[in-house]
Amino acid sequence: GELYPTNPTNLVGELQSLLEQAKVEPPQTPAASEQPSGDLYKFLYTAGLSDEANAQCVNRLYQGQFLYNDAFGWLFWTGSHWTKEGAEAALDRATVTTLLSRIEAASQPETFEEGGKVRRFCLPNKGRVQGAEHMLSSLVISQPGEFDTEPDLLNCGNGVVDLRSGKLIAHDPGQRFTYCSPVDYKPGASSEQWVSFLEAAVGAEQAA
């Protein structure tokens, strides 16, 4: 039988509460790139009943936020760089939130009557979460050699500096950095103190 109350209004309210709870931990919980509504609800509802379908839904909701390769395992986009730290926990939260979003999509007034199979299939549990994540790994595969390969680019707190031109570039997941300098780049900052240090350390001729 149905595991949820028969009143769709009550169910949606309960699911919204669960979705909020799913987002509060761990600290590095990713934000969905789309909020469930309209076409996205349709995608989540009609994706199918398989681990692959759940993986496709995670990939749609969290596009560009996770990568996988055999050397590093799971990587998570922090907004400035890719990191292994907390990546698996962040992925678990993203997967649980996706499953709850699929249940929510199957609990709308227009989908509630026929949505029982989706609601039952997408109940978050260890097997369902791990199955989706296993299938997701091949959708977001990367190669270890893709990372930190740009010697002329420096990743700073407020963007990426092109050392050849001094131009500041916005952070982007396509930039495969696994580090981020804790300081911001200031284009107009004076280098006088740094030059003075070099001159004192190695001599004016070598510093020049």
Where are these regions (language model features)?
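Modules that initiate DNA replication and primer synthesis
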Residues: G1-L40, Y68-S107
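Residues that form generic nucleotide/phosphate-binding pockets
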Residues: L3, E14, L18-Q21, C57-L61, ...
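Short, solvent-exposed helix-helix connector turns and helix-capping sites enriched
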Residues: N7, L49, A204-E205
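Alpha-helix initiation and N-capping motif
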Residues: P8, V12, D51-A55, E88-D92, ...
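Extended, Lys/Arg-enriched charged tracts that mediate electrostatic binding to polyanionic substrates
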Residues: S33-C57, G115-V160, R164
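Basic chromatin DNA-binding modules
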Residues: N54-Y68
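P-loop NTPase catalytic core of nucleic-acid-dependent motor ATPases
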Residues: Q65-A90, F112, F147-D148, L153-L154, ...
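A short, charged
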Residues: I103-M135, S190-V195, E199-Q206
